[in-house]
Amino acid sequence: MERTPNPNNQPVELNRTSLYLGLLLVFVLGILFSSYFFN
């Protein structure tokens, strides 16, 4: 898989947003699982 550097693309920002989305997803899933366990 070869990736050509694109000046219009910002891989750092994309990685940061994907990282934040992943953390948010894990956080929401943790809250849901904790609510299921506590109830």
Curated annotation (Swiss-Prot):
Its main location: membrane. The chain crosses the membrane at residues 18-38. The keyword Thylakoid applies. It is a single-pass membrane protein. It comes from the Bacteria. It is found in: Cellular thylakoid membrane. One of its GO terms (biological process) is photosynthesis. Coiled coil: none annotated. It holds the Pfam family PsbL. Belongs to the PsbL family. One of the components of the core complex of photosystem II (PSII). PSII is a light-driven water:plastoquinone oxidoreductase that uses light energy to abstract electrons from H(2)O, generating O(2) and a proton gradient subsequently used for ATP formation. It consists of a core antenna complex that captures photons, and an electron transfer chain that converts photonic excitation into a charge separation. This subunit is found at the monomer-monomer interface and is required for correct PSII assembly and/or dimerization. This is Photosystem II reaction center protein L. The gene is psbL.
